[in-house]
Amino acid sequence: KAIKKAKQSSNSSHVIYLSPQGQKFNQKRAEEFLQHRKIILLSGRYEGIDERVIESEVDEICSVGDFVVSGGEIPALLVIDAVCRLEKGVLGDPDSASQDSFSDGLLEFPQYTRPDSNEFGEVPDVLLGGNHSEIAKWRLKESLRRTFKLRPDLLKKKVLTNQEKALISEIKSEENS
């Protein structure tokens, strides 16, 4: 009844059931979900929900990972947060979402704050120099380095530019020396 009522109050809603059996949720899926202006997230508890409801009311099944939790509430919160932050005006800086991990198929570059030097080390000089093209190159290289080390599977899926290929060669040389 709740699904039908929600559908009535918002025409053309897209119903997503959160279950480990669904297609895996990722940044690309968050961007796709944003295209649906009205979404109903359906979360089960313990054993899930009645199959007849899934067959008659659900448009797609979505999983947040290869694990099981007690209910779908926390996965629903993850989906809500990932989708909402892509909505124009939600983040203070409109460029923030486009620089996040996974937005371009890579992990995000390292972040540094003030002061320039503290007990944990120094901020890289290139970030303090003010040369925006050098900073952009450093960010790309460090993003590639981090992805290469921590999530090499992402690089296999990405179509690399010539610049990215050259930077990965540099990274491999640096790692081997």
Roles of regions detected by a PLM:
Residues 1-45, 51, 88:
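S-adenosyl-L-methionine/SAH cofactor-binding core of RNA-modifying enzymes
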Residues 74, 86-126:
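Internal, active-site/partner-interface "lid" segment
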Residues 5, 78, 82, 137:
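Alpha-helical scaffold segments in soluble metabolic enzymes
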Residues 115-177:
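SAM-dependent methyltransferases
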Residues 32-35, 61, 119:
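Solvent-exposed alpha-helices and their adjacent loops that cap or buttress functional pockets
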Residues 18-21, 43-46, 65, 72, ...:
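Fold-independent oxyanion-binding glycine-rich loops
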Residues 53-100:
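Structured adenosyl-cofactor binding patch, chiefly the S-adenosyl-L-methionine
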